Curated annotation (Swiss-Prot):
GO molecular function, one term: ATP binding
Full protein name: Long-chain-fatty-acid--CoA ligase ACSBG1
First-tier enzyme category under EC: ligase
Subcellular location: Cytoplasm; Cytoplasmic vesicle; Microsome; Endoplasmic reticulum
Highest taxon, organism lineage: Eukaryota
Family recorded in the similarity comment: Belongs to the ATP-dependent AMP-binding enzyme family. Bubblegum subfamily.
List of residues binding ATP: 282-290, 472-477, 550, 565, 701
Organism: Macaca fascicularis
Modified sites of kind Phosphotyrosine: 658
């Protein structure tokens, strides 16, 4: 985090006892509880010369003394199961098997403050050194931010929208929004000005937080169309010039000093667990984005029980260390990094904004997380990078890695639950694999999670070969994150784990193989879509069950297996229902040169076809795909007799590569369940899918409708030729 002069937060100049400045986050795990909280609260850990007084903490503690917290009763009138109003309330789905009383975000933070006040909460880089913020400092920064929002005119059940990369400011602004009675709303940093306008208008944003001038420019372009917007705060860079109602973070936090603590306390006292505190907007692939309303109970329940199901541990047992880098506007990252972090006293370290362009591995090495979450595409990129390095290694090192991964994969597939490893497996780990994990930053990582999209069998097998087991979670924005979780205790390859305690599932309209639509019920289920009653009624039935639109099956032990989206199910002209994902995965497994494969067959097409992209390197500055093939792709070409090193050398020209792909698809067809599942035509696209190209969403999930529209001419050509 670079120092900014007079704008936003730079490096602190306060008492060094307030904030540990060390080379690596690991050292900050030592001596976390030396001294009392009040002795350390002399200056802010992020602001220059801004005091966090003992009186402020004393006041906060008096507000939330254990007796007051434990005796507090939430107002639980007979409410409906859903609402579309930002100021509405809902009836909570409390299961007798897990009947914990609902509580608010403030109470969750207070309990963390009581147990973990002196533990490191947030870690960030400042002038190439890691700095740390304790939970006590974090709490008071959130309170000051809350008072700043009140001073700027934040109204009850209106939003503070945050448009910026993950940072301490994102975190304590989000918590401060909830404390102030507002609703925190994340906006993807890749959003256009028009997309920002839609979300800010829909959620009635009173304040928008931006991290850079680039993001500020987006808001300035649409401000006149945002009648509820009162102020913008920029927190990483100074504004280009002085503008009315545009504040630096330092100015914003100073505003909070003008609001009495009692004014904030009064708002906190009136908050109820069944009120909205978070809005998560869907990607909008099938229309305008929908605002998913999550209650305080959704957040506190999921942060506790969803994470417990994933074996996340409280800091008094072992402080979890995580790296925050995925977009916080997505529920998976927000619940995992922000809210679960508070629940269990985790240390959250922030990656650089260019994490997904290549710097993530450097942060992982420095931080050495104990648990880590990535969307499948992130894990695939790590896999491809390892494969590239291996291809460039000497013969002996490459053979050693292949041997070690082979014996380890075989052991993990044949005896997945066994702690007793054969000598050869232990030797392989000692000589080779432990060093690979250390180079990746996973030397201390005990839990590696993925979610938000399906993962290929190839990727799972690759990491099993490294002795890295990837645990799946299944959920949606509408389930506040995970409704099913895998963990070291509940793991089955290719499954999405078991139900989170207190949650329910049923499969409706099951076929002969037991596959049906997944319907969910429990404390994770969202309040409703903001201002969209028709969409809410489509999603939630009269008994309160959420219809996910996903198809899946349950095995005898309760493990869930996702088979695809019902909307993505391809219905051929012959009436066959074809789930695309298994076929796409089979093609990528058979052909290691393929980056993306998308099955085509919608609109009652007479046969299946497929669009393919090739694995290529990414531009280090933009993360856009280049024309250069990856080392793995070049190796594939050489194996089949091609000298190609770029995509353009292959598309429409390279007979050797085309023949190899044709043979691979023929092998996939031979293993298909029936002829209607065969891929009859295919094409290689000139450019890999990307976020900038529109084919991938912010979490790198495939946007099928966009692909169908963008490559309509190519797709139509498959079927025009059939008519001739």
């Amino acid at each position: 985090m670079p120092r900014n002069s007079g704008a936003g937060y730079g490096c602190p100049h306060g008492d060094p006892s307030m904030l540990d400045s060390r080379e690596t986050p690991q050292e900050s795990r030592q001596d976390m509880t030396v001294g009392t909280t009040q002795e350390k609260l002399k200056t802010s850990s992020l602001t220059d010369r801004q005091p966090l007084s003992k009186e402020s903490l004393n006041h906060a503690l008096k507000l939330s003394v254990p007796e007051k917290v434990n005796n507090a009763q939430w107002d639980a009138p007979e409410e409906a199961l859903w609402t579309t109003r930002a100021d509405g309330r809902v009836r909570l789905r409390i299961d007798p098997s897990c009947p914990q009383l609902p509580y608010t975000v403030h109470r969750m933070f207070y309990e963390a403050l009581d147990k973990y006040g002196d533990f490191s909460a947030l870690g960030f880089k400042c002038q190439d050194k890691w700095e740390h913020i304790s939970y006590s400092q974090y709490y008071l920064l959130a309170r000051r931010a809350a008072k700043g929002f009140l001073k700027l005119g934040l109204e009850r059940a209106h939003s503070v929208a945050i448009l910026g990369f993950n940072s301490p400011e994102w975190f304590f602004s989000a918590v401060g929004t909830v404390f102030a009675g507002g609703i925190v709303t994340g906006i993807y940093t890749t959003s256009s000005p028009e997309a920002c306008q839609y979300i800010a208008y829909d959620c009635c944003a009173n304040v928008i937080m931006v991290d850079t001038q680039k993001q500020l420019e987006k808001i300035l372009k649409v401000w006149k169309q945002l009648p509820h917007l009162k102020a913008v705060v920029i927190y990483k860079e100074p504004p280009p010039n002085k503008m009315a109602n545009v504040y630096t973070m330092e100015e914003f936090m100073e505003l909070g000093n003008e609001v009495p603590e009692e004014a904030l306390d009064a708002i906190i006292d009136t908050q109820q667990p069944n009120q909205c505190c978070v809005l998560v907007y869907t990607s909008g692939t099938t229309g305008n984005p929908k605002g998913v309303m999550l209650s305080q109970d959704n957040i506190t329940w999921t942060a506790r029980y969803g994470s417990q199901a994933g074996d996340i541990r409280p800091a008094e047992v072992q402080q979890e260390v995580v790296v925050s880098y995925l977009p916080l506007s997505h529920i998976a990252a927000q619940i995992y990094d922000l809210w679960t972090g508070i629940q269990w006293g985790a240390q959250v370290c922030f990656a650089e904004p260019d994490a997904l362009k290549g710097s993530l591995v450097n942060t992982l090495r420095e931080v050495e997380p104990t648990s880590h979450m990535g969307v499948p595409r992130v894990w695939e990129k790590i896999m491809e990078r390892i494969q590239e390095v291996a291809a460039q290694s000497g013969f002996i090192r490459r053979k050693m890695l292949l041997w070690a991964m082979s014996v380890t994969l075989e052991q993990n597939l044949t005896c997945p639950g066994s702690d007793l490893k054969p000598f050869t497996t232990r030797l392989a780990d000692y000589l080779v694999l432990a060093k690979v994990r250390q180079a990746l930053g996973f030397a201390k990582c005990q839990k590696n999670f993925y979610g938000a999209a399906p993962m290929t069998a190839e990727t799972q097998h690759f990491f099993l070969g490294l002795n890295i087991r990837l645990y799946a979670g299944y959920g949606l924005s509408e389930t506040s994150g995970p409704h099913f979780m895998s963990s070291p205790c509940n793991y089955r390859l290719y499954s999405s784990g078991k139900l989170v305690p207190g949650c329910r599932v049923k499969l409706v309209n099951q076929d002969t193989e037991g596959i049906g639509e997944i319907c969910l019920w429990g404390r994770t289920i969202f309040m409703g879509y903001l201002n969209m009653e028709d969409k809410t009624c489509e999603a939630i039935d009269e008994e309160g069950w959420l219809h996910t639109g996903d198809a899946g099956r349950l095995d005898a032990d309760g493990f869930l297996y996702i088979t695809g989206r019902l909307k993505e199910l391809i219905i051929t002209a012959g009436g066959e229902n074809v789930p695309p994902v298994p076929i796409e995965e089979a093609v990528k497994m058979e052909l290691p040169i393929i980056s993306n494969a998308m099955l085509i067959g919608t609109d009652q097409r007479k046969f299946l076809s497929m669009l393919l992209t090739l694995k290529c390197t990414l531009d280090p500055d933009t993360s856009d795909p280049t024309d250069n093939l990856t080392e793995q792709a070049v190796e594939f070409c050489q194996r089949v007799g091609s000298r190609a090193t770029t995509v353009s050398e292959i598309v429409g020209k390279d007979e050797a590569v085309y023949q190899a792909i044709e043979e691979g698809i023929r092998r996939v067809n031979m293993n298909a369940a029936a002829r209607p599942y065969h891929i009859q035509k295919w094409a290689i696209l000139e450019r890999d899918f990307s976020i900038s190209g529109g084919e991938l969403g912010p979490t790198m999930k495939l946007k099928r409708l966009t692909v169908l529209e963008k490559y309509k001419d190519i797709i139509d050509s498959f079927y025009r030729e059939q008519k001739m």
